[in-house]
Amino acid sequence: MFGARLEQLPYIWERLVDAGFESGQAYGKSLRNVKSCMGSTWCRFGVQDSTGMAVKLENRYRGLRSPHKFKFGVSGCNRECAEAQGKDVGLIATTNGWNLYLGGNGGANPAHGRLFVKDASSEDIIRYIDRYLMYYIRTADKLQRTARWLEDLDEEHGDGLAHLQSVLIEDSLGVC
Protein backbone atom coordinates (compact mmCIF):
# COMPACT_ATOMS: atom_id res chain seq x y z
CA MET A 1 0.00 0.00 0.00
CA PHE A 2 1.33 3.33 -1.02
CA GLY A 3 2.58 5.32 1.94
CA ALA A 4 2.38 2.51 4.49
CA ARG A 5 5.39 2.08 6.73
CA LEU A 6 6.89 -1.33 7.39
CA GLU A 7 5.87 -1.35 11.04
CA GLN A 8 2.23 -0.69 10.03
CA LEU A 9 1.95 -3.75 7.79
CA PRO A 10 0.99 -6.34 10.46
CA TYR A 11 -1.88 -4.12 11.60
CA ILE A 12 -2.97 -3.42 8.02
CA TRP A 13 -2.95 -7.14 7.13
CA GLU A 14 -4.91 -7.98 10.28
CA ARG A 15 -7.59 -5.44 9.37
CA LEU A 16 -7.78 -6.73 5.79
CA VAL A 17 -8.11 -10.36 6.91
CA ASP A 18 -10.77 -9.40 9.47
CA ALA A 19 -12.69 -7.67 6.67
CA GLY A 20 -12.65 -10.88 4.59
CA PHE A 21 -9.84 -10.11 2.17
CA GLU A 22 -7.39 -12.84 1.17
CA SER A 23 -3.70 -12.79 0.42
CA GLY A 24 -1.64 -15.02 -1.83
CA GLN A 25 -3.00 -14.83 -5.35
CA ALA A 26 -0.76 -11.88 -6.21
CA TYR A 27 2.50 -13.76 -5.74
CA GLY A 28 1.95 -17.51 -5.39
CA LYS A 29 2.41 -20.23 -7.97
CA SER A 30 -1.33 -20.29 -8.52
CA LEU A 31 -4.12 -18.45 -10.28
CA ARG A 32 -3.17 -14.78 -10.35
CA ASN A 33 -6.35 -13.21 -11.64
CA VAL A 34 -9.23 -13.61 -14.01
CA LYS A 35 -9.44 -10.59 -16.27
CA SER A 36 -12.88 -9.89 -17.68
CA CYS A 37 -14.62 -7.33 -19.82
CA MET A 38 -18.14 -6.14 -19.00
CA GLY A 39 -19.81 -8.78 -21.16
CA SER A 40 -23.48 -9.03 -22.01
CA THR A 41 -24.50 -7.58 -18.65
CA TRP A 42 -23.28 -4.07 -19.49
CA CYS A 43 -21.92 -4.03 -23.04
CA ARG A 44 -24.00 -3.83 -26.21
CA PHE A 45 -21.52 -6.11 -28.01
CA GLY A 46 -21.41 -8.82 -25.32
CA VAL A 47 -22.99 -12.14 -26.23
CA GLN A 48 -22.32 -14.02 -22.95
CA ASP A 49 -21.98 -13.10 -19.27
CA SER A 50 -18.20 -12.83 -19.15
CA THR A 51 -18.16 -11.23 -15.70
CA GLY A 52 -20.24 -14.03 -14.20
CA MET A 53 -18.02 -16.64 -15.84
CA ALA A 54 -14.88 -14.87 -14.58
CA VAL A 55 -16.17 -14.85 -11.00
CA LYS A 56 -17.08 -18.54 -11.28
CA LEU A 57 -13.59 -19.41 -12.58
CA GLU A 58 -11.80 -17.33 -9.96
CA ASN A 59 -13.78 -18.89 -7.12
CA ARG A 60 -13.20 -22.39 -8.50
CA TYR A 61 -9.44 -22.19 -9.11
CA ARG A 62 -8.10 -19.62 -6.64
CA GLY A 63 -5.36 -21.00 -4.45
CA LEU A 64 -4.75 -24.03 -6.69
CA ARG A 65 -1.00 -24.65 -6.56
CA SER A 66 0.75 -25.24 -9.86
CA PRO A 67 4.23 -25.33 -11.43
CA HIS A 68 4.00 -21.59 -12.18
CA LYS A 69 1.53 -18.75 -11.96
CA PHE A 70 -1.34 -18.84 -14.41
CA LYS A 71 -3.78 -16.21 -15.62
CA PHE A 72 -7.24 -16.37 -17.12
CA GLY A 73 -9.06 -13.95 -19.41
CA VAL A 74 -12.77 -13.93 -20.28
CA SER A 75 -14.02 -11.78 -23.17
CA GLY A 76 -17.74 -11.33 -23.78
CA CYS A 77 -17.40 -11.06 -27.57
CA ASN A 78 -14.85 -11.29 -30.35
CA ARG A 79 -13.64 -7.73 -29.71
CA GLU A 80 -11.48 -9.42 -27.06
CA CYS A 81 -11.40 -6.60 -24.49
CA ALA A 82 -10.07 -8.94 -21.77
CA GLU A 83 -7.16 -10.04 -23.98
CA ALA A 84 -8.12 -13.67 -23.43
CA GLN A 85 -5.83 -15.05 -26.14
CA GLY A 86 -2.83 -13.71 -24.25
CA LYS A 87 -3.62 -15.67 -21.09
CA ASP A 88 -2.81 -19.20 -19.96
CA VAL A 89 -6.53 -19.93 -20.22
CA GLY A 90 -8.71 -17.67 -22.33
CA LEU A 91 -12.41 -17.68 -23.11
CA ILE A 92 -14.05 -15.69 -25.88
CA ALA A 93 -17.84 -15.69 -25.96
CA THR A 94 -19.75 -16.68 -29.07
CA THR A 95 -23.48 -16.66 -29.69
CA ASN A 96 -23.38 -20.45 -29.22
CA GLY A 97 -21.14 -20.70 -26.15
CA TRP A 98 -17.43 -20.16 -25.59
CA ASN A 99 -14.23 -20.56 -27.57
CA LEU A 100 -11.45 -21.85 -25.30
CA TYR A 101 -7.83 -20.82 -25.91
CA LEU A 102 -4.95 -22.48 -24.08
CA GLY A 103 -1.27 -21.70 -23.59
CA GLY A 104 -1.09 -17.96 -24.15
CA ASN A 105 1.12 -15.60 -22.21
CA GLY A 106 2.49 -12.07 -22.19
CA GLY A 107 5.84 -10.86 -20.96
CA ALA A 108 9.20 -11.01 -22.70
CA ASN A 109 8.17 -13.90 -24.98
CA PRO A 110 4.47 -13.35 -25.65
CA ALA A 111 2.36 -16.07 -27.22
CA HIS A 112 -1.24 -16.21 -28.34
CA GLY A 113 -3.23 -19.05 -26.90
CA ARG A 114 -4.27 -21.82 -29.24
CA LEU A 115 -7.91 -22.50 -30.02
CA PHE A 116 -8.74 -25.71 -28.16
CA VAL A 117 -12.51 -25.94 -28.70
CA LYS A 118 -15.24 -23.81 -30.31
CA ASP A 119 -18.76 -22.98 -29.12
CA ALA A 120 -18.56 -25.10 -25.96
CA SER A 121 -21.16 -24.84 -23.21
CA SER A 122 -20.22 -23.34 -19.85
CA GLU A 123 -20.36 -26.82 -18.29
CA ASP A 124 -18.02 -28.27 -20.90
CA ILE A 125 -15.65 -25.31 -20.50
CA ILE A 126 -15.35 -25.98 -16.75
CA ARG A 127 -14.74 -29.68 -17.41
CA TYR A 128 -12.01 -28.94 -19.98
CA ILE A 129 -10.30 -26.39 -17.74
CA ASP A 130 -10.39 -28.84 -14.80
CA ARG A 131 -8.73 -31.48 -16.94
CA TYR A 132 -6.26 -29.04 -18.49
CA LEU A 133 -5.05 -27.76 -15.13
CA MET A 134 -4.84 -31.29 -13.72
CA TYR A 135 -2.75 -32.43 -16.68
CA TYR A 136 -0.55 -29.31 -16.56
CA ILE A 137 0.07 -29.63 -12.82
CA ARG A 138 0.92 -33.34 -13.13
CA THR A 139 3.22 -33.10 -16.19
CA ALA A 140 4.81 -29.64 -16.43
CA ASP A 141 8.26 -28.94 -15.06
CA LYS A 142 8.58 -26.77 -11.97
CA LEU A 143 8.43 -23.06 -12.91
CA GLN A 144 7.26 -23.86 -16.45
CA ARG A 145 4.54 -21.59 -17.85
CA THR A 146 1.75 -23.13 -19.91
CA ALA A 147 3.00 -21.63 -23.21
CA ARG A 148 6.41 -23.30 -22.86
CA TRP A 149 4.78 -26.51 -21.63
CA LEU A 150 2.62 -26.58 -24.76
CA GLU A 151 5.76 -26.07 -26.88
CA ASP A 152 7.31 -29.08 -25.13
CA LEU A 153 4.17 -31.09 -25.94
CA ASP A 154 4.65 -30.04 -29.58
CA GLU A 155 8.19 -31.44 -29.54
CA GLU A 156 7.16 -34.62 -27.77
CA HIS A 157 3.95 -35.40 -29.70
CA GLY A 158 4.31 -33.47 -32.97
CA ASP A 159 1.22 -31.37 -32.24
CA GLY A 160 0.76 -30.42 -28.60
CA LEU A 161 -2.73 -29.04 -29.12
CA ALA A 162 -3.95 -32.21 -30.85
CA HIS A 163 -2.41 -34.22 -28.01
CA LEU A 164 -4.27 -32.10 -25.44
CA GLN A 165 -7.53 -32.52 -27.35
CA SER A 166 -6.99 -36.28 -27.39
CA VAL A 167 -6.22 -36.42 -23.66
CA LEU A 168 -8.74 -33.88 -22.39
CA ILE A 169 -11.72 -34.37 -24.70
CA GLU A 170 -11.39 -38.00 -25.81
CA ASP A 171 -9.68 -39.22 -22.59
CA SER A 172 -7.07 -41.14 -24.59
CA LEU A 173 -4.99 -41.78 -21.45
CA GLY A 174 -7.96 -42.92 -19.37
CA VAL A 175 -7.33 -40.32 -16.67
CA CYS A 176 -10.43 -38.14 -16.92
State what each model feature region is.
Residues A26-Y27, P67-K71, R138-D152, H163, ...:
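Flexible, glycine/charged-enriched surface loops at secondary-structure junctions
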Residues N33-V34, V74-R79, A147-L161:
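A glycine-rich phosphate-binding loop feature that marks nucleotide/adenosyl-phosphate handling sites
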Residues V17, F21, R62-S66, D130-K142, ...:
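Generic secondary-structure signature for well-ordered alpha-helical cores
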Residues P10, E14, V55, N59, ...:
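A broad, structural surface signal
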Residues R5, L9, G46-S50, A54, ...:
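Generic structural signal for well-ordered, non-membrane alpha-helical segments
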Residues F2-T95:
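Small-residue-enriched alpha-helical segments and adjacent helix-cap loops
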Residues K71, G76, E80, Q85-Q144, ...:
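Mobile "lid/hinge" segments at catalytic clefts and subdomain interfaces of large enzymes
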Residues R5-Q8, I12-R15, G20, E151-C176:
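Terminal amphipathic helices with adjacent charged low-complexity linkers/tails
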